[in-house]
Amino acid sequence: MIGKVVVSVASILLIVGVAIGVVAYINKNGDANLSPQMKAVRGICEATSDKASCVKTLEPVKSDDPNKLIKAFMLATRDAITQSSNFTGKTEGNLGSGISPNNKAVLDYCKKVFMYALEDLSTIVEEMGEDLNQIGSKIDQLKQWLTGVYNYQTDCLDDIEEDDLRKTIGEGIASSKILTSNAIDIFHTVVSAMAKLNLKVEDFKNMTGGIFAPSDKGAAPVNKGTPPVADDSPVADPDGPARRLLEDIDETGIPTWVSGADRKLMTKAGRGSNDGGARIRATFVVAKDGSGQFKTVQQAVNACPEKNPGRCIIHIKAGIYREQVIIPKKKNNIFMFGDGARKTVISYNRSVKLSPGTTTSLSGTVQVESEGFMAKWIGFKNTAGPMGHQAVAIRVNGDRAVIFNCRFDGYQDTLYVNNGRQFYRNIVVSGTVDFIFGKSATVIQNSLIVVRKGNKGQFNTVTADGNEKGLAMKIGIVLQNCRIVPDKKLAAERLIVESYLGRPWKKFSTTVIINSEIGDVIRPEGWKIWDGESFHKSCRYVEYNNRGPGAITNRRVNWVKIARSAAEVNDFTVANWLGPINWIQEANVPVTLGL
């Protein structure tokens, strides 16, 4: 059937979200004697994780208009996070001068991330406006920000090492976590409702509130591809369009959803001073020999403008930069490129075990708090060693991160993919325990995963995803067309040291391995439980079409899914897992979605 289907967001909310919720509520409770206001409230709250809290929050709102109810819920969530932030500050004050360096560091970090959460919630409320008909294709971006708001709160708790303090803060911020969780559920219901009607968010016309019927084009096929090749550089790419993993990857290896201007930057920023530095004009140049504007990377970051609509381009010339680099939240759209991942190296030694006043989040050699970060031909290293325990090489908290041809070297917690949507291609990442971990939607393609030798008696786990809410949040790690191999120092003991593809850090941990070569360094069981927890019973672990001695699945744990068809992993392709791409459409840049 050809033709337009015109329907507003509010209509979807009211007809599908609210109506289905009310029917479900009435069927369950047998009570049809509800006021219009309570019908709307019960309908909206039916899909939330904590219905009682949701209803209690919305009961005082004297309206049955979904626009006003959902807006009121967001404002209540913002108020709750303000209270959580105040509670954290008060707790730090109550500890007085006797507070330990680690507790002070983590509480200061908590105050910072609560500030980030409040900023994002204020943006959400502003973007929502007074009429939900106007949010159109913003729905998924709002949901992405809400996911970040939730993650900021869990970041605070995850970084607290002391049990008593974690319990105190956990109880103090419980209300804001519940409200944020419910807010995510409400937005998830909206998106799911549109899916039930076979409508797509990106089809919304913001000015009219209407949408077109969805395209009938099929999903891009998943190709087996070829394994990457390890050398002194990051992993070599397969040649030619016939070997593209997805229709969303062009002949340069860059996703088509990256804007035209950024694609040019990625293409021009080649390895070596005779290639990259000469081909694009950097905003700032960093050089240890004084030939640039700055001698440290942090100085260049500090010089970049805040809330930049364009790109701040930093060329880091060859050299080892022994510094910790922090990119604040307002320093968005920074693009760093070096002269080679082994030539331009940012290195630092900071760890939870050996550095007083350090948390996992604060241990990162490079810490990216901002959106739109890009990097190419740079090495990121934490030199704390296995005795340092958690020691992050890079932590990326910002949405829309794109990283190519880089190295990440460390031991425990090397690559912290902690928030937003992140895409990595042709990287090398090495480590021991949970060395690719976080709470983001991340795809790593055509990369070399190197399992290292840690402390005596220590096991290795490649991944540790932190999804706490399941399908309502798009959080999970995807490794596609990668190679998983032992480091040279581990090779002789690779069959003795226990190494696994991952373990579930949180209740709904999500990790997918697709079209990858898995060496015999990985044990036949494949995956490990998180000691003391039952997260393996609810996690979502999937393997599809892998190869190599470590990919044999007949002895796998019984809680991993072995997919037999491409359709079973289609949700985890770049197009689906890192989309929708409305954030590029809103920026009015060229984008190719399909063929």
From Swiss-Prot:
Residues 1-24 form the signal peptide. GO terms for biological process: cell wall modification; pectin catabolic process; pollen tube growth. Pathway: Glycan metabolism; pectin degradation; 2-dehydro-3-deoxy-D-gluconate from pectin: step 1/5. The record marks 412 as: Transition state stabilizer. The keyword Cell wall biogenesis/degradation applies. In the N-terminal section; belongs to the PMEI family. In the C-terminal section; belongs to the pectinesterase family. The PMEI region may act as an autoinhibitory domain and prevent untimely PME activity during transport. The PMEI region is cleaved by SBT6.1 (S1P) in the Golgi apparatus prior to cell wall targeting. This is Pectinesterase 5. It comes from Arabidopsis thaliana (Mouse-ear cress).
